Each structure stands twice: as structure tokens, then as C-alpha cells.
């Protein structure tokens, strides 16, 4: 009878341990999904600003139609990438699609703003100044949200990969999550601004 109680106690311990690890993995997965929702909010804000930016510069840059169309197309592709990533945050394919689309959009916006520099009246426009300020602020919020997401993904993956949690993760198919790295962002951050007199 005593051995049976000891075996039941050991079984109960491992069962409770398994439930605790499983719940921890679920909590961690929900954490990175919530962090992705914050990226979604900021990217939607960015997408909402782009049509206003395009409308503002359209009158000044009539012969730069190709640049404007590239930004609009990149915005559309980025929205599609966001929809795929929103459905499966942390999924390698969805994150790669979103990263590529955001990289394209960053490049298009960079070209648009570079071309806008050639139009002094446009640069001095109050509407353009306000839009570029809002866009820069939103870009900072996207970067912050992306960092929070990547931190949450790393915490989930660490929890998922360490022994003995990896036993529960493998049993219940907790796939590793993938961080979001947008092409071009890191290079721009490493490169110091050039000052010339």
C-alpha cells in the first residue's frame, strides 16, 4: 500500500509539473502573439499615413509618377504581408514575407522622401512637415514594438528549447517562433550620419 501511494504521489507530481510547463509555454506563446499585435497597430498607422503622404507630394511631383506608384504598390504588398503574419505570428514563412514587404516599403518611402528633398516648396509645406514627423514617430514605434516582439519570441524559444520543457514542447508540437528582422533597418542604424560643412 505504501509503494502504491509513493507511485501515485510521483505520478501526481509529474502530471502537475507537465501542466505547469504546458501552461508556461501557452503563456509565453500568447506573450509573443500580443507583442505582434502591437506591431500590427503601428504598421496599420504607418499604412494609413502613406496615402496622405502620396497625396501631399503628388501635386509637386507630377513627373515622379513611377516613384509614387512604387510606394503605393509596396504599401499594398506590405499590407498583404502583414495579414499573413497576423494570422500566424512567429511562423517562419509569414515573418519572411512580412520582412521582405516591409523592406520594400522602407526602400520606396526612402526614395520618395529623397526625391521630395529636391522640391523646396514641398519640404516647406506644413502638411509635408507634419506627415514626415508622424511617419518618423510611427517608424520609432514600429521599431520599439518589433524589439518587444523579438524579445518575447526569444523568451518563448528559450522556454521551449530548455530541458525538461522541451519534452512537453515536443509532445504538444510547440514549433519555434521566428523573430522579425526587416531588411535595411540594421544597416541604417549602424551607419552614422555624415556631416559636411
What are these regions (language model features)?
Residues 1-197:
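A helix-centric hydrophobic-segment signal that preferentially recognizes long
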